Amino acid sequence: MSEQCPCGSTLEYQRCCEPYIMGTEIAAKPSILMRSRYSAYVKKNVDYLIATWHPDCNAEQWRDGIIQSFSNTTWQGLTVIAEMAGDHDNEAFVEFIARFKDANSTQVSAMHERSRFLRIKEHWYYIDGIRPSVGRNDTCPCGSGKKYKKCCGR
C-alpha cells in the first residue's frame, strides 16, 4: 500500500521526499529541501538531517540531541507559506509552519520559521532560521483558529 508523503504534498512518499532522503536525487530548490527535511524528522532520519545542514554548522555535534528529540516529538503537519530569493543566487528563504505534539503535552504546538538556505555548487543546505514573533492577540500559528494567548502561548 502506498504512503502519502509527510511533507503535506499530495504525492506518495516514494515519489516525493524519499528519493532525496535516500540520496538518489538532489533537491533542486530550497522548498524541496525544506519539505524533505521535515519528512526526515517524521521518519527519524538523523543522517539526512545532518547531511543537509550547511557544513559551517558542524551539525554532527547535534546528532544525539536530534535522536533524543525523535522520541519526544510527534509531527502533525507542515504548511509552506512562501519561498523567497535571497540577496544573491545562492541564498533563499522558506517560511513555514510545522505542527507537532510534545510527549509531555496533549496540545498541538507550532513552529513558525523563516529558514535560510545556502547553495554550494548544486546542493542547497539549511543554515539557520528566524522565528517570527507572535503577538498574544494574534491567531495562533498552530492552525487552531484561537488567539495565541489562549492556545500555544499559555
UniProtKB/Swiss-Prot annotation:
Pfam families: SEC-C (PF02810), YchJ_M-like (PF17775). InterPro entries: NTF2-like_dom_sf, SEC_C_motif, UPF0225, YchJ-like_M. It comes from the Bacteria. Belongs to the UPF0225 family. NCBIfam families: PRK01617.1, PRK01752.1. This is UPF0225 protein YE2246. It comes from Yersinia enterocolitica serotype O:8 / biotype 1B (strain NCTC 13174 / 8081). The lineage of its organism: Bacteria, Pseudomonadati, Pseudomonadota, Gammaproteobacteria, Enterobacterales.
